[in-house]
From Swiss-Prot:
Reaction(s) this enzyme catalyzes, per UniProt: an acyl-CoA + acetyl-CoA = a 3-oxoacyl-CoA + CoA
Assigned GO CC terms: cytosol
Active site: C99 (acyl-thioester intermediate), H392 (proton acceptor), C422 (proton acceptor)
SUPFAM superfamilies on file: Thiolase-like
Protein name: 3-ketoacyl-CoA thiolase
InterPro entries: Ac-CoA_C-AcTrfase_FadI, Thiolase, Thiolase-like, Thiolase_AS, Thiolase_C, Thiolase_CS, Thiolase_N
GO MF, any single term: acetyl-CoA C-acyltransferase activity
Species of provenance: Shewanella sp. (strain ANA-3)
EC code(s) of this entry: 2.3.1.16
Pathway of action: Lipid metabolism; fatty acid beta-oxidation
Taxon lineage: Bacteria, Pseudomonadati, Pseudomonadota, Gammaproteobacteria, Alteromonadales
Similarity comment: family membership: Belongs to the thiolase-like superfamily. Thiolase family.
Subunit structure: Heterotetramer of two alpha chains (FadJ) and two beta chains (FadI).
Top-level EC class: transferase
Superkingdom of this protein's organism: Bacteria
Length: 436
């Protein structure tokens, strides 16, 4: 059996990435304060359809995701279909794979095209850290269920008497891993210590990311892949990411205190991604349908892979596990790639993965390979800046990476690119795209 992955339909046609778009990414409680993930999702899909001049009725499937769930609209994909002029019979379902969510939605649509079930679909993801599902305590939740069944006033009063003041306080969403109780920041600290990653190196990577992102915006390269978002009640708008440090000064990074390990830590707010709001989406088609409709795809999916590792120690190593699998399925080695886009959740996590890419020992002990994945050429790596600068709306990052690497390859005359990310739960995702 061949290790090569056939990302084609029964006719041998490739899976085309026809277009991609995102909202600007905004820090929590700024430009998108009060705007839900659903509203941002509808916003970006509407604009994507308008820009591509694609009849919404031609969309056969929409797969969309979010990480911070909205109890009022748990199937965000279906609500986007109903709110964007698509046919009401359009297949729509929602997915979640933590920070790799829109990698998953893209693969799901691609696989629907590969099997011949559809020829045109949309994938993406959105998250709001400003519109959060605020919960109640377990004791209050239990009491509310009992109240619903209580018949007499006396029974209801007895239920209320079981509650203390602290039981009435709202409960914010958990930021820790359910199975371990560790936050992503604590995991990044683990990784910094495990792989001896210095504070100076973390700050330097963050500075590089912000500097490149600022230069990219100034060059106009992102104009066609980032929409202008008009925010309800439509008296203001946001046209670019607002987390990027313009004129980033490396010396200023050293002034911040550690955020997670106050005494001995090195992970700070400056070398971590902030909580972010935003949405992104891509249009996928069979190669033949794209050609018939007159589109010039921005890229094609060559291979993809998902992996999982233990969550107790250094769980944000997903790229180091998913990338070699995607490369193997594409029949490639790291040095064959033209560009590499790796999600920068934290500088420590990014540097740890880069270190393990170059480690023969890691490859032998963890991957069963007789050679390292390869040393990353920094002239190919996150050349437009990364998540440390742009921000990270969890479910939107995957399709942001895919669109960004495809469009940059197009500007450079084509080639192959890797988009890869770590994710909570010890998950990893990688996708290799080819651009003509």
């Amino acid at each position: 059996m061949s290790d090569r992955q056939q990302v084609t339909n029964a006719k041998g046609e490739r899976i085309a990435i026809v277009a991609g778009l995102r909202t600007p990414f905004a820090k929590q409680a700024t430009a998108f304060h009060g705007v839900s993930a659903l509203d941002m999702g509808k916003m970006v899909v509407n604009e994507l359809l308008a820009r591509s001049e694609l009849d919404p009725k031609l969309i056969e499937q929409l797969v969309y995701g979010q990480v911070v769930q909205m109890p009022a609209a748990p199937n965000i994909a279906r609500e986007i279909v109903l709110g964007t002029g698509m046919d009401v019979s359009t297949d729509a379902y929602s997915v979640t794979r933590a920070c790799a969510t829109s990698f998953q939605s893209a693969v799901n649509v691609a696989e629907s095209i590969m099997t011949g079930n559809i020829e045109i679909g949309i994938a993406g993801g959105a998250d709001s850290s400003s519109v959060l599902p605020i919960g109640v305590s377990k004791k209050l939740a239990h009491a509310l269920v009992d109240l619903n069944k209580a018949r007499s006033f006396g029974q209801k009063l007895q239920i209320f008497r079981r509650l203390g003041i602290k039981d009435l306080l709202p409960v914010p969403p958990a930021v820790a891993e359910y199975s371990t109780g560790l936050s992503m920041g604590q995991t990044a600290e683990q990784m910094a210590k495990t792989y001896n990653i210095s504070r100076a190196d973390q700050d330097a990577l963050a500075h590089r990311s912000h500097t490149l992102a600022s230069e990219t915006w100034a060059s106009g390269h992102l104009r066609d892949e980032v929409m202008v978002a008009h925010v309800p009640p439509y008296k203001q708008f946001i046209e670019r990411d607002n987390n990027i440090r313009e004129n980033s000064d490396l010396s200023s990074y050293a002034k911040l205190r550690p955020a997670f390990d106050k005494k001995h830590g090195s992970v700070t707010a400056a070398n971590s991604t902030p909580l972010t709001d935003g949405a992104s989406a891509i249009i996928l088609m069979s190669e033949g349908r794209a050609k018939a409709l007159g589109y010039q795809p921005i890229g094609y999916i060559k291979s993809y892979a998902f992996t999982a590792i233990d969550v107790w120690q250094d769980m944000l190593m997903g790229p180091s596990y998913a990338t070699p699998l995607a490369l193997k399925r594409a029949g490639m080695e790291l040095e064959d790639l033209t560009l590499i886009e790796m999600h920068e959740a934290f500088a420590a996590q990014t540097l740890a993965n880069m270190q393990m890419f170059a480690s023969k020992k890691f490859a032998e002990e963890k991957l069963g390979r007789n050679r390292a994945i390869g040393e990353i050429d920094m002239s190919k790596f996150n050349v437009l800046g990364g998540s440390l600068a742009y921000g990270h709306p969890f479910a939107a990052t995957g399709t942001r990476l895919i669109t960004q690497v495809c469009r940059e390859l197009k500007r450079r005359g084509g080639g192959t690119g890797l988009a890869t990310a770590c994710a909570a739960g010890g998950l990893g995702a990688a996708m290799i795209v080819e651009v003509e």
